[in-house]
Amino acid sequence: MGLLPLVKKLGFIIFLLVSASAFALCSAGRSSILIYSQEDDHPEVVERRIHEHERILRMNSRDYGHSSPKPKLVRPPFKLIPN
């Protein structure tokens, strides 16, 4: 009879541990992008990023080969079945 309250308390403690660890895992991640906001103010950094963006836009996409269509499957010629 005294075992039921102990099981309930133990279950509640396990539930709290699982939910706390789930919250810790969900909140983990990369740091905020606001950390890097001070670096963006320099004109040299802005100019370099503009130059890199222009270079990426001018990149030739034909450098990676050509896209040839897959060969179509042709039906084999009809073969007569001998009687």
From Swiss-Prot:
Positions of post-translational Hydroxyproline modification: P69, P71
Residues bearing the modification Sulfotyrosine: Y64
Signal sequence, start to end: 1-28
Disulphide-bonded residues: none
One Gene Ontology CC term in the entry: Casparian strip
Tissue and organ distribution: Expressed exclusively in the root stele.
InterPro entries hit by this protein: CIF1/2
Region (Disordered): 61-83
Induction remark: Induced by excess iron and further synergistically regulated by lowering the medium pH.
UniProt record, GO biological process: Casparian strip assembly; pollen tube growth; regulation of root morphogenesis
GO terms of molecular function: hormone activity
Subunit structure, interactors included: Interacts with the specific receptor kinases GSO1 and GSO2.
Protein purpose: Peptide hormone required for contiguous Casparian strip diffusion barrier formation in roots via the regulation of CASPs protein expression and distribution in a GSO1-GSO2 signaling pathway. The Casparian strip is required for ion homeostasis (e.g. iron and potassium ions).
Name of the molecule in the record: Protein CASPARIAN STRIP INTEGRITY FACTOR 2
